[in-house]
Each structure stands twice: as structure tokens, then as C-alpha cells.
Design a protein with these regions (language model features):
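Short helix-coil junctions and helix-kink-helix linkers
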Residues: 1-21
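C-terminal helical accessory/scaffold domains
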Residues: 24-37, 41-173
Length: 173
């Protein structure tokens, strides 16, 4: 059988202290990113509107940081670039996808620079994101990936819009 240490109470105290430390660090990070108000003296915290938007739209923490860092007057090209950088929108780039995506990339609203090609998962998401409004027919395996990117982008864009309305600023108003 399993032998438990004689000092199980001490083990529980150490575990509790580690959990408390992790929670405090997480709260400090949320506060630093502007998602909560945290009183470090009392430990009291309250949700900011940004956190409510994040929760409502089910936006991942790292994606929310990207959204909060957007310039209030960012261009659509910048918006596409930044959203495609969000891990929750990225799909795996396969070797067979590159030729098809590079061909479509030439005709996008916001194409790559002439020397740039699709090389990363972020590049693939950037292309797929721009092909959604044009309803471009893709090969079967990429259709599901494009739908995945489109659904995720809708959530993220809804968060961007809610934040713009909340702050009464931004190019989306």
C-alpha cells in the first residue's frame, strides 16, 4: 500500500501555501492586464468591464491581452494581423496547404508583401480569416479549418465591439 508521511498536516499546509501563492500571482497578472481591480493590502478584487466581456465572449486570456492592446483606431489590416496572432484562431499549417494558401493570398484585400509567403500557423489563419467574407471555395480539409477560424473570429470581434462601445471610442463605432 501507499505510506503517508507522519506529518500529513505539514504537507497540507505547504500545499495550501503553494496554492495561495499561485492564486495571488494569477490575480496580480489579471490586475496588471486591466481585467480586475485588486487591493493588494486587503486582497479584495472586483471585476472590470473588460473581464466581463472576456467571460461573456469566452475569450482566452492571451487573446484578451492582444485585444486590449489594439489601438482604438487600428486599421482592418492591423485587426486581421492581430487576431490571426491569437492562439485560439490558429490552425496547423500543413505542407500541402502552402501552395493553395499562397495562391489565395495574392488576391486578398490585405495581401502579404511581395516577398512574403505563408510559412506559419499565424499566416494560415491570416489568409483564412480574409477569405471568409469573400466566401472563397477551399479544398475540403480547409473548409472546416476556415469555419473554425471564422467562429473564433466572431467571438473575438464581438469582444472588440463590446469594448469599443464600453469605452465609447475606437474605429469600430
Amino acid at each position: 500500500g501507499i505510506k503517508l508521511p507522519n506529518n500529513i498536516g505539514e504537507f497540507e499546509l505547504i500545499l495550501e501555501e503553494k496554492m495561495k501563492d499561485q492564486c495571488c500571482r494569477a490575480l496580480e497578472r489579471l490586475s496588471q492586464e486591466g481585467l480586475i481591480n485588486l487591493d493588494t493590502v486587503t486582497g479584495e478584487c472586483s471585476c472590470r468591464p473588460e473581464a466581463a466581456v472576456m467571460s461573456r465572449q469566452m475569450v482566452q486570456f492571451n487573446s484578451m491581452i492582444v485585444i486590449l492592446a489594439l489601438s482604438p483606431l487600428c486599421s482592418l489590416k492591423e485587426l486581421f494581423r492581430e487576431l490571426s496572432a491569437c492562439a485560439e484562431l490558429q490552425v496547423v499549417l500543413k505542407r500541402d496547404d502552402k501552395k493553395i494558401l499562397n495562391e489565395h493570398a495574392k488576391h486578398m484585400e490585405y495581401p502579404f508583401k511581395s516577398s512574403e509567403k505563408v510559412k506559419t500557423d499565424q499566416d494560415k489563419s491570416y489568409v483564412l480569416l480574409q477569405l471568409v467574407p469573400d466566401r472563397v471555395k477551399l479544398v475540403e480539409n480547409m473548409v472546416k479549418e476556415q469555419e473554425y477560424v471564422a467562429h473564433g473570429a466572431c467571438r473575438l470581434l464581438s469582444a472588440v465591439i463590446e469594448l469599443a462601445i464600453e469605452s465609447q471610442s475606437g474605429g469600430l463605432l
